[in-house]
């Protein structure tokens, strides 16, 4: 798929920027924890995590049309992360990353934050449905399982 490629060490800072920005924009409003989202969570630490854990980087693919605008991280048949830089959202980049992961990496399910209605709607538009399964991450973050439909 055009513009999608495996992530490399050179992408680590952009991957970290995209993830941190999305956490702040999408999750801070729900959890309202400024000390975490604007203190503990930072690009330097996130980039270091990806540099030190090669499995994280190996499982990432980026959308790069000259600028890295989005990332998807896949483990087995699970989509673990999918984020697009907010300035480039609503341009089909997330859908292209997800389509790539479904077609090339055989992604069939994911866990979505229960409060993230925008994200859940995006996944539904792209062929996923809620399964009814719910889990708590870190004992306080409610996640809902979504599975790819047979279409």
Spans of model-derived segments:
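A short beta-loop-alpha structural element at the N-terminal edge
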Residues: 3-17
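Conserved GNAT-fold acetyl-CoA-binding loop/helix
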Residues: 20-50
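Conserved beta-strand in the GNAT
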Residues: 62, 66-83
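A structural microfeature
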Residues: 68-70, 94, 132
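A short, internal acetyl-CoA/4′-phosphopantetheine-binding micro-motif in the GNAT/acyltransferase core
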Residues: 78-89, 112-113
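Conserved acetyl-CoA-binding loop-helix of GNAT-fold acetyltransferases
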Residues: 84, 90-103, 121, 125
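Conserved GNAT acetyl-CoA-binding A-motif
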Residues: 103-115
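Conserved catalytic-core motifs of GNAT/GCN5-like acyltransferases
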Residues: 111-113, 129-145
């Amino acid at each position: 798929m055009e513009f999608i490629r495996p992530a490399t060490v050179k992408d680590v800072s952009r991957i970290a920027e995209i993830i941190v920005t999305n956490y702040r924009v999408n999750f801070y409003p729900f959890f309202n924890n400024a000390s975490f989202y604007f203190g503990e969570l930072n690009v330097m630490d996130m980039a270091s995590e990806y540099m030190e854990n090669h499995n994280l980087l190996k499982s990432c693919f980026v959308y790069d049309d000259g600028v890295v605008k989005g990332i998807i991280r896949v483990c087995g048949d699970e989509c673990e992360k999918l984020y697009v830089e907010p300035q480039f959202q609503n341009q089909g980049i997330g859908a292209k990353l997800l389509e790539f992961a479904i077609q090339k990496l055989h992604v069939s399910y994911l866990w979505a934050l229960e409060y993230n209605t925008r994200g859940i709607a995006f996944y539904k538009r792209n062929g996923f449905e809620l399964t009814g399964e719910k889990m708590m991450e870190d004992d306080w973050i409610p996640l809902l399982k979504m599975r790819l439909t047979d279409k």
